[in-house]
């Protein structure tokens, strides 16, 4: 009988057959007729061949497929996948892939360099614990925001009432941007989820005029000083440029914003990939309380290696804002697997630190081996 535990041993058949007249007349067709009478018509015809091979020595041969492109189409989903695989023009093929925004396990041969995900976490120990609890997590409702904000606070050592948990950071970004008023300062190029959520005429864009798109706190202060913005978006490290500003300098920017009544929206989704990552985050009660104009957003997809869980957090000492975000999302906005990840994460905190260190080692090795220019360089200490 078929077993998913043994799929590595199975072959997938591309069903193009060539039978001799004698084989068809004396073996295949008689067995096919007997099989349909015994089992019915709504069965796979390959089963007939399987029965024949078990009962009789046959001279059936199979040709292994190597680089040939093929796809079996049984339903509308298969047709959609095949349309992407067999698109004639590269531009059309790219369009077919990009409109999916994920789900690329349907294309096993694809190498995805778009989404930066830590391949060294979760550790095998953590995966084992999640596998062991799969059945109960699959069949039980998750908790609501009260419990999940408590868990997120535990993971990041931040008070529960400063935290909101989202179905990915994207859910929180959508809710926040819909509530934002006034003009938004944005450094381009950027992660488009933020500016896409507000009217274009409300965006004040700053594009660094240099080769590596680098900028400092002083650059931001100089450009936005007279722009009358209500919110300044800082993605740090930036996506996609990689520009990085140290935590002390970000605090200088937070103070500058506070003096001018500007909200600093800080996205730290990639901060754990930075060289000094353990001292680069502003996720702490003390900092949040000192700067009530500061909002920190963090995706749990990237450095934690779990984009499929759809998990993100938002933190601020502006409790009215956090409470408003919590009311805006649905009662069960994350699933049981994402909740359980937060529930057990602290047991594997050391594994996570090792994974981040290993990621940095591999990045350095890769850059050296391929003679790549990285931005920012590990030695690049940008000052304000």
Task: Show the residue positions of the predicted features.
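Active-site pre-lysine segment of PLP-dependent enzymes
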Residues: 215-226, 240-303
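Short loop-beta-helix segment that forms the pyridoxal 5′-phosphate
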Residues: 141-142, 153-175
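PLP-dependent aminotransferase class I/II
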Residues: 12-16, 293-371
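Conserved small/polar residues in nucleotide/adenosyl-binding loops
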Residues: 373-383
